[in-house]
Amino acid sequence: MKQKTFEEIKEELLLRAKKAGACQIGYAMGLRSQSKADILKAITDNWSWVSRTARIVDAEYLEDNFAEEDLAEAGIYTQKYHEVTTTSFACDSATVKAYGSATVKAYGSATVKAYGSATVKAYGSATVKAYGSATVKAYGSATVEAYDSATVEACDSATVKAYDNSYVEDLTGNIRPQSGYAVIKDYYNHKIYIQKGRYQIIEVD
């Protein structure tokens, strides 16, 4: 397949964005793009809308039109295994291990392992394992395993397994603690679930 030029990619994406009703600021970023790096910056700055809401690009489009090193420079991973400490975007079959204060947005069938104070937003059928004091927001049919002191907010039909001292805010009504002293705050049924171990639960008004 013939490689598209920068000008062709820019024109195509601007047309897609216009048809999808892009916001003025996001569209202007694309319009001002002078290189593929600028286009990728516009994509990552509007990642959720571009890849999930309007579906302007997917992993296949990115792989077909941008070099792997250009995607990596922008923090976008569509395949293989990567370790990151900065803002990153994982989709398709990518596996990302996030450390420190890294922020990862995961889509499709991406897999993320989050440590330290990393933050993950998981959509679609993404899988996340959260350790340390990592924070996860799970949407769609995302699957999360929370360990240590990880914090999870689960929405839609997300699935969460909570272990150790993890804390889960459950908007699905389907999540229960697995082991350790995990706490589930169930907003759907207005209940709190605790693996109490040897501790006695005292209710206070």
List each language-model region with its residue ranges.
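Short, glycine-biased loop/turn motifs at secondary-structure junctions and
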Residues: 1-107, 113-115, 121-123, 129-131, ...
